[in-house]
A protein has these predicted regions:
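Active-site donor-binding segments of glycosyltransferases and PAPS-dependent sulfotransferases
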Residues: 69-137
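Membrane-proximal helix-turn-helix segments that form the acceptor-binding/catalytic region
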Residues: 166-199, 207-208
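Conserved donor-binding/catalytic core segment of Leloir-type glycosyltransferases
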Residues: 225, 240-259, 265-276
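Nucleotide-activated donor-binding/catalytic signature segment of Leloir-type glycosyltransferases, i.e.
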Residues: 285-308
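Conserved acidic donor-binding segment of nucleotide-sugar-dependent glycosyltransferases
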Residues: 299-300, 352-353, 357-364, 371-378
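Acidic donor-binding loop of glycosyltransferase active sites
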Residues: 311-323, 336
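Short hydrophobic beta-strand element within catalytic cores of glycosyltransferases
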Residues: 318, 337-342, 350
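A charged, aromatic-enriched C-terminal amphipathic alpha-helix characteristic of glycosyltransferases
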Residues: 362-365, 375-407
Length: 415
């Protein structure tokens, strides 16, 4: 494996340097994406940029919302894996870096970390205005015009490295590599942030982190949830018997060590409560071994199937520290409350007693106590739906368009 990684890094570096000024045709792996420098492409009025499109998460849902807000805007990104992210991206024009030609790095984007400063710096975005969705890389792309940076978080692998890697991977190849190149990454990241005048945070927690890390005072635009109130639901094949009674708790998360999925499993095992986990990630095998007969773990489902899982659950468990955390809003669209960790973005989206209840620490003991105490009859479904409507995609699109209009007007006036 290490030899494959080393070969991929060497090969990718050569690709980036030798191909950065060339244009490639649409690739089969990332249809209709184009892998190349974009020097010959006519500059659009507006473009969208994002770190990489290789997974299904809240940041990727924000990019989908940006695509719906600006459907003609091309999306620039370092890596794109169609089968790994949301299928709706297949309808977008996606332009990738030369790094996308290395299959191993598309599948395991963390292996690309040492190459991403160079890759990002070489990825030209020739647009008059760019809306940049970033967790640490896209704000360093090579922009030719104005940019509005929508920040999900300053780079976690720099400023929250232990959380990003998890205890078991601190001394892994990637963990050691990050420590070695930390000064280079910090220099690159701080310089990229300094070149970006117009920042927006996605939550109060990120607003505070941007102030601490970059010294910027920025406004907030809350991200949207994927509305489920009017969506047609589709049962998940093979789970009808498990979910039919509507007596299960739901957890929707990437299966990473810092997400505390193991604590939720232990809590439900002890309490004898059903738990449906939707997500994928490197911790899956470990979590399967930990799970009792009351737990199911699934992944790769459609939005309609996700909607069905939300509608028929007792409540959502949201027990990791999230910078914003969209899942409580997705649950709320179906009138479902949340048992959440009192931290981070959940403080923006959960009003205690209305659409959720808090635990003080994400331990199995506190999760167990909360699910034993939980009574579904105490929650008003319609009140929950009314509350989370303020986080709708329509509201997000209106606020983003207004921010872009203000940026364009400011640029035109020379202010």
């Amino acid at each position: 494996m290490l030899n494959r990684v080393a070969q991929s890094w060497r090969g990718a570096s050569a690709h980036i340097r030798s191909l950065a000024s060339k244009k490639f045709p649409t690739s089969a792996e990332s249809r209709p994406a184009v892998s190349a420098d974009i020097g010959s492409v006519t500059a659009p009025r507006l473009a969208i940029a994002h770190d990489y499109l290789t997974q299904r998460g809240g940041a990727e849902r924000v990019v989908l919302a940006l695509h719906r807000a600006f459907p003609e805007a091309p999306i620039y990104t370092t890596l794109y894996t169609p089968e790994g992210t949301f299928p709706e991206f297949e309808n977008a024009t996606i332009i990738t870096s030369p790094l996308n030609r290395v299959g191993l790095l598309r599948r395991y984007h963390r292996l690309a970390l040492p190459l991403l400063p160079l890759t990002a710096s070489c990825l030209k975005v020739p647009a008059h205005v760019a809306v940049v969705s970033t967790t640490g890389w896209a704000h360093g792309f090579k922009f030719t015009g104005e940019k509005l940076v929508y920040c999900h978080s300053p780079a976690r692998w720099l400023y929250l490295r232990d959380q990003y890697l998890g205890d078991e991977k601190k001394n892994s190849v990637i963990g050691v590599g990050l420590r070695v190149i930390d000064p280079l990454l910090r220099f690159w990241d701080q310089r990229a942030a300094a070149r970006s005048e117009h920042y927006v945070a996605n939550s109060t927690a990120i607003q505070e982190r941007i102030s601490r890390v970059y010294g910027k005072d920025v406004p907030i635009i809350f991200p949207p949830y994927s509305g489920g109130a009017t969506r047609v639901e589709e049962p998940v094949a093979g789970l009808q018997e498990f979910t039919a009674a509507g007596d299960y708790f739901l957890l929707v998360s990437r299966l990473m060590s810092y997400k505390n999925v193991d604590e939720a499993i232990k809590a439900c095992n002890r309490a004898g409560k059903k738990l449906l986990i939707i997500g994928h990630g490197p911790e899956k095998d470990k979590l399967l071994k930990l799970s009792g007969p009351n737990v199911r773990i699934i992944s790769g489902i459609s939005d309609e199937q996700l909607c069905s899982a939300y509608r028929h659950c007792l409540a959502l468990l949201a027990v990791s520290h999230e910078d914003f955390g969209i899942t409580p809003l997705e649950a709320g669209a179906s009138g479902k409350p949340v048992i959440a960790y009192r931290a981070g973005g959940y403080l923006d989206t959960i009003r205690e007693g209305l659409n959720g209840m808090f635990i003080e620490q994400p331990t199995s003991e506190q999760i167990e106590a909360a699910i034993r105490k939980f009574n579904p009859e105490e929650w008003d479904k319609q009140a929950i739906k009314n509350y989370i409507a303020r986080f709708s995609e329509e509201r997000f699109i209106d606020e983003i368009r207004q921010a872009v209009d203000e940026l364009t007007a400011s640029s035109s006036s020379g202010a």
